[in-house]
Amino acid sequence: MRFPFFASFIVFCIWLGYEIHKHRNKQAKVDQEFWQTEAAANNTRRKSLDDLEYIKIPFDSLPMNLLKEDSEIADYHHTLIELSNSPIVNFTGISNTDLKLQYGAPNIELLSRYDQSYTTLVRTLQDWAEVLFEKGYTNEACSILEF
């Protein structure tokens, strides 16, 4: 009775050791590929940013005159006006490594600022639409969110 249990335990330990070893090898390969790609990205020269899809804020299609005396909405307007003076690009879903490979490592700070501007734009539009919705301006809130 003890021998089958002991033998099963030994087989289980050997199998577990094999699986752990296999997982470590697989993870080491993934890590190595990541660092090779990262090294290649860090050595990429600066490339042109002309093909980026810059976002322009369409002030004429946004309800800029609605409740503009409200201080909270005035803050959103001010943020949007400031954002309109800076480049805005949506890099959602694109890793920094991919950005460095495509546009060059020296551009990563600039591209990060463009993406941060996009994040600020989206957050501001969401907050502005929420305030309008709460005040009963459903259609105007929808037009903001549809942008």
Per-range role (PLM):
Residues 131-132:
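Residue at a conserved register position within TPR or TPR-like alpha-solenoid repeats
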Residues 114, 127-128:
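Residues at structural and domain junctions
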Residues 2-122:
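N-terminal alpha-helical interaction modules that lie
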Residues 119-126, 138-139:
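Generic helix N-cap/helix-start motif at coil->alpha-helix transitions
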